[in-house]
């Protein structure tokens, strides 16, 4: 047992004893005492993140106010701004005086979960799920793959998941992420241009945007220079543009840079010839002044600010409505280079999934009550609100109106947002945390969001037909040893690849640089990493 674990055990011994007694006493009570609302107000403690420039007190958000009224459970929150979360949550998890009963929006990686489990900072939840979490149990019963994805190699579940189904397989909304590529249809029409279908045609369109900058500025009242194409490298990423080069793998996984071949082999996308050739082509665009010079360093707010000024001809994002006027844009289909292909995002065939969304800590004096309260987040009527927002707000916009489904049951109907940005309204209302929104819920408990529906339609129309890849890397829960071994090498591998992407687009790449790059990745442990990924892929398909 390591020193940190011994120290934590000494500090928490008294708290754990009290917690065990409370848990045993709850179990022995009559059934109605554990049904909400509780007879007396009870206080639990939790940690949560919130988006910058939104309400910082969770208990002032309508969702949590309603939950307190319905349960008689008051939550004392430690609220941390989202852009400070990673640093502060790490410190809080290491300090018993800062720990709360649960961490609502943990967002922990597998490495985090297994480390905190080893230190006994968090508790296993599988028994609580089976005994007092009927909503989550129902999700696991209907979709057993999610329980499998939450369970470690020793059979423990250390966290409660976030699950969002919007489509399935190659039509799932997550198959194309922040790399969805949009082109300014208003500009195309004004200049008499067609939507490009090849990389050569695409370059010609960008040149036309550049060469007709003054006409575009005059016609549409644009202040500031015309930017033929912008993105945020390794975030709002241009990987779809190079998907057709070489073997057609592209590079959609900007965290791990892996893909799965049709022969079920895990490969590194960044060591394929198509990766090099695609970035060399993008260097040509950069040399022509067709790419925003800030695309490699800008943050989200800068990116959006320029987009809202109407300066972009092409850009990448989850939803163009967050950047510019939706009606002025259309999706850019896959471009033909050596081939034509769209590589889906890894893990996307089972929908949106986050294994480490919420944890219960060892300081919880009544973990059963904590789990009962958290199970309410998986109620089919509650989950959509936690995920997107709610109804009955006092401000200008609501995400939902309270309506009825075809059977007369209550249903959340998405409300019109006018010119408001969907992400801004959602951030003002939603609370996140553990939840499950399933395809079965649409038109029963909630309508499909308009912005999700048009995105689903776009994927099915423009991208699914060109998803020639049969497999994506699935969500797997590796052992602590393999997780640690990967963590030891993945960071250097990812940093090297991400840095090379920016460098090669700006400065080009020589054959010697390419060989040195591959040698560096091998020295960092690329082959060992691929072996670990392959082991779990083989096991996944052997089941």
Language-model features, listed with the residues they occupy:
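Conserved N-terminal structural module of periplasmic/extracytoplasmic solute-binding proteins
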Residues: 2-10, 21-201, 213, 249-258, ...
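Glycine-rich, aromatic-lined ligand/substrate-binding cores of catalytic
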Residues: 201, 278, 284-287, 303-320, ...
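Short, flexible loop/turn elements at secondary-structure junctions
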Residues: 48-52, 79-84, 93, 104-108, ...
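Helix-loop-helix "hinge/cap" segment bordering the ligand-binding cleft or interdomain interface
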Residues: 126-128, 154-238, 260-306, 360-394, ...
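Long, His/Glu/Asp-enriched segments that create or flank divalent metal/ion-associated functional microenvironments
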Residues: 65-66, 317-320, 445, 449
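Carboxylate/His-rich catalytic cores and anion/metal-binding grooves
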Residues: 120-150, 206-210, 220-259, 310-326
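Conserved small-residue motifs centered on glycine
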Residues: 380-503, 508
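General small-molecule cofactor/ligand-binding pocket signal
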Residues: 74-80, 294, 330-332
């Amino acid at each position: 047992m390591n020193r940190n674990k011994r120290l934590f055990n000494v500090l928490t011994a008294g708290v754990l004893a009290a917690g065990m007694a409370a848990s045993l006493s709850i179990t022995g009570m009559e059934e109605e005492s554990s049904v909400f609302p509780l007879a007396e107000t009870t206080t639990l403690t939790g940690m949560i993140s919130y988006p910058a420039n939104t309400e910082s007190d969770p208990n002032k958000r309508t969702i949590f106010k309603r939950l307190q009224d319905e349960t008689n459970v008051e939550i004392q929150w430690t609220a941390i701004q989202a852009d400070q979360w990673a640093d502060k949550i790490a410190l809080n998890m290491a300090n018993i005086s800062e720990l709360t009963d649960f961490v609502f929006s943990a967002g922990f990686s597998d490495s985090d979960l297994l480390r905190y489990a080893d230190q006994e900072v968090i508790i296993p939840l599988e028994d609580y799920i089976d005994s007092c979490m009927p909503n989550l149990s129902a999700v696991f019963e209907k979709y057993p793959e999610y329980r499998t994805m939450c369970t470690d190699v020793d059979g423990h579940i250390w966290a409660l998941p976030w699950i969002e189904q919007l489509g399935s397989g190659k039509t799932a909304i997550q198959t194309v992420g922040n790399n969805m590529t949009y082109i300014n249809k208003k500009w195309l029409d004004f200049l008499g241009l067609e939507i490009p279908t090849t990389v050569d045609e695409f370059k010609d369109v960008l040149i036309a945007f550049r060469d007709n900058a003054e006409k575009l500025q005059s016609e549409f009242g644009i202040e500031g220079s015309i930017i033929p194409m912008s993105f945020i490298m390794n975030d709002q990423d241009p990987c779809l543009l190079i998907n057709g080069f070489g073997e057609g793998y592209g590079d959609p996984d900007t965290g791990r840079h892996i893909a799965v071949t049709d022969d079920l082999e895990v490969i590194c996308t960044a060591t394929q010839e198509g990766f090099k050739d695609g970035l060399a082509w993008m260097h040509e665009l950069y040399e022509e002044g067709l790419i925003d010079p800030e695309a490699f360093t800008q943050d989200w707010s800068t990116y959006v600010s320029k987009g809202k000024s109407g300066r972009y001809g092409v850009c990448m994002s989850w939803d163009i409505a967050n950047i510019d006027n939706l009606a002025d844009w259309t999706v850019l289909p896959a471009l033909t280079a050596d081939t034509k292909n769209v590589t889906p995002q890894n893990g996307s065939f089972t929908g949106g999934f986050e294994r480490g969304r919420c944890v219960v800590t060892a300081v919880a004096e009544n973990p059963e009550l904590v789990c009962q309260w958290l199970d309410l987040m998986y109620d089919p009527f509650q989950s959509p609100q936690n995920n997107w927002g709610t109804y009955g707000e006092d401000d200008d916009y609501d995400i939902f109106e309270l309506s009825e489904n075809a059977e007369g049951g209550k249903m959340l109907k998405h409300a019109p947002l006018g010119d408001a940005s969907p992400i801004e309204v959602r951030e003002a209302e939603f609370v996140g945390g553990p939840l499950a929104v399933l395809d079965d819920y649409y038109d029963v408990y909630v309508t499909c969001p308009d912005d999700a529906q048009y995105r689903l339609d776009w994927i099915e129309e423009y991208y699914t037909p060109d998803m020639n890849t049969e497999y994506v890397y699935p969500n797997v829960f590796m052992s602590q040893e393999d997780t640690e071994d990967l963590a030891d090498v993945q960071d250097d591998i990812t940093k090297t690849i991400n840095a090379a992407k920016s460098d090669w687009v700006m400065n080009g790449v020589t054959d010697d640089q390419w060989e040195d790059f591959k040698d560096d990745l091998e020295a960092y442990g690329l082959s060992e990493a691929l072996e670990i990924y392959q082991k779990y892929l083989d096991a996944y398909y052997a089941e």
